[in-house]
């Protein structure tokens, strides 16, 4: 792919690499692509429905057939020159059937923010966790938040961490390691 800042995951179902969205050559992307692990060949996935083009969004695996995609920054046309904006919406997608469903969208936020590349999903509590940071200034900060998958209600879980946001040169992600 010619774009960066896409979301990615290794499928628990077929062990292939999937990517969504991203940014490149002054365009925001909303393609779903699959890399076959045994062939090193990319294939565009035909989705039924669409998610507006974006980057700086979070993706997490909800189940074997379901991923969640939250937030981001982009424009409905994909064109940077038309004035991008922040997204605060949550989508559920099945990369195997191509089904996409919008679960909810939050109102414009007082302080604009984008999110880390990954989210951690807790299906027992019906929450997802991601790192959030303002994308309207370079001296920024990261904060861990939880969001209710049903309605988008959020809660800040920790103090902030200083973060030098430098647009396409900035990257953060979130990982979870189960304690045995």
Regions found by a protein language model. Give the residues of each.
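Entry beta-strands of beta-propeller and related beta-repeat scaffolds
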Residues: 14-19, 65-70, 125-130, 179-180
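Beta-propeller blade signature
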Residues: 29-41, 82-99, 140-154
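Post-signal peptide N-terminal segment of secreted/secretory-pathway proteins
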Residues: 1-27
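Short, conserved, GDST-rich strand-edge loop motifs in beta-rich repeat architectures
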Residues: 20-24, 69-87, 129-141
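Beta-propeller and closely related beta-sheet repeat lectin domains
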Residues: 4-9, 53-60, 115-120, 170-175
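Intrinsically disordered, low-complexity segments enriched in Gly and acidic/Ser/Thr residues
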Residues: 120-167
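Conserved blade-ending motifs and adjacent loop-strand segments that build the rim/top face
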Residues: 101-117, 150-178
């Amino acid at each position: 792919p010619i774009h960066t800042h896409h979301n990615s995951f290794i499928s628990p179902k077929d062990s292939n690499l999937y990517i969504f969205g991203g940014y490149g050559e002054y365009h925001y992307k909303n393609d779903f692509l699959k890399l076959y692990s045994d062939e090193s060949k990319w294939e565009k996935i035909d989705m039924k429905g669409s998610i507006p083009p974006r980057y700086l969004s979070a993706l997490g695996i909800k189940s074997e057939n379901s991923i969640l995609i939250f937030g981001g920054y982009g424009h409905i046309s994909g064109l940077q020159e038309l004035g991008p904006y922040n997204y605060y919406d949550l989508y559920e997608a099945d990369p195997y059937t191509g089904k996409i469903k919008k679960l909810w969208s939050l109102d414009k936020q007082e302080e604009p923010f984008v999110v880390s590349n990954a989210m951690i999903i807790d299906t027992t509590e019906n929450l997802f966790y991601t790192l959030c940071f303002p994308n309207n200034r370079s001296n920024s900060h990261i904060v861990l938040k939880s969001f209710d998958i049903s309605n988008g209600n959020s809660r800040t879980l920790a103090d902030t961490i200083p973060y030098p946001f430098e647009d396409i040169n900035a990257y953060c992600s979130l990982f979870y390691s189960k304690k045995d």
